[in-house]
């Protein structure tokens, strides 16, 4: 499995691995990610071995960092090839993020079956780059095929988005019995979840922190959690303190919500970005 950089790339890979393990208990699964991405926490927490390939995205502005990114784009497939030769997989599956490029490119060059999953309606850069190299392109939206079909019509399969099993609790009552979701509210009458993805979203953080300051701090019966994201974490903490919110036990600022299925099943309101995986998770819950 390969996919990294954000939760939107890592979590579907974990969901696929989870399903493979369920159907083929004796299967061996390893992940390849970057040294810096959230996969280093999520993959290891899920109990899988994680290899590293250093690869970085190009910045749109002129930057010396682009020189290193270009160098890594050229050298990373060789590193990925060594990992693949060592692990000897029967198939390599990617779920996006820059790290999928060298790993799937290396797999294709070695003649190992490969596929990439695209969760968005418009395919990302990595999917477009790999489309002619991989054996199969898995799609969440039928419309995505319009952007790839002229060149790769026989490769595409409409499958939807892979979700971790915890998201298929159809109601709070059902989820409470199966996964202890009732504890997620910690005794509060209502719960609000707010998040802008694993990296964070500045405007969502600012709006939600203002909401905490002006509304939820006056409602101690409401548990309000904001996951600020890794990039926005420092700024969100400064604003949290500036608004004097640190002393309210019902107001929580965290970097990432690691028990999202449990929390989401118990939530009365979710405020979030409309990322493809996030929308799929909410749809599965409701």
Please place each PLM-identified region on the residue numbering.
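Acidic, amphipathic alpha-helical patches
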Residues: 39, 73, 80, 126-127, ...
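Conserved nucleotide-sugar phosphate-binding/catalytic loop shared by glycosyltransferases and other
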Residues: 1-6, 23-75, 159, 230-231
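Short amphipathic alpha-helix
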Residues: 9-20
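A donor-sugar binding/catalytic signature common to diverse glycosyltransferases
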Residues: 94-95, 260-286
């Amino acid at each position: 499995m390969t996919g990294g950089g954000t939760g939107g790339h890592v979590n579907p890979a974990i969901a696929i691995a989870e399903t493979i393990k369920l159907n083929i208990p004796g299967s061996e699964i390893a992940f390849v990610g970057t040294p810096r991405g959230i996969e280093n926490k999520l993959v290891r927490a899920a109990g899988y071995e994680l290899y590293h390939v250093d690869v970085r995205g190009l910045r749109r502005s002129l930057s010396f960092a682009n020189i290193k990114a270009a160098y890594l784009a050229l050298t990373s497939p060789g590193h990925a090839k060594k990992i693949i030769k060592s692990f000897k997989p029967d198939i390599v599956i990617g779920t996006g993020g820059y790290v999928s490029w060298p790993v799937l490119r290396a797999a294709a060059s070695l003649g190992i079956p490969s596929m990439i999953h695209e969760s968005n309606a418009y395919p990302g850069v990595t999917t477009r780059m790999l489309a002619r190299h991989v054996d199969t392109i898995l799609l969440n939206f039928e419309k995505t095929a319009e952007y790839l079909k002229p060149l790769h019509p026989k490769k595409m399969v409409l499958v939807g988005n892979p979700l971790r099993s915890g998201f298929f609790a159809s109601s709070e009552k059902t989820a409470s019995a199966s996964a202890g979701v009732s504890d997620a509210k910690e005794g509060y009458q209502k719960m609000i979840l707010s998040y802008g993805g694993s990296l964070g979203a500045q405007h969502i953080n600012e709006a939600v922190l203002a909401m905490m300051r002006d509304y939820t701090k006056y409602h101690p019966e409401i548990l309000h959690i904001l996951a600020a994201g890794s990039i926005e974490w420092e700024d969100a903490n400064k604003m949290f303190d500036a608004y004097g919110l640190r002393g309210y036990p019902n107001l929580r600022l965290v970097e990432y919500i690691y028990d999202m299925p449990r929390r989401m099943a118990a939530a009365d309101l979710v405020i979030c970005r409309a990322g493809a995986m996030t929308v799929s998770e909410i749809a599965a819950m409701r």
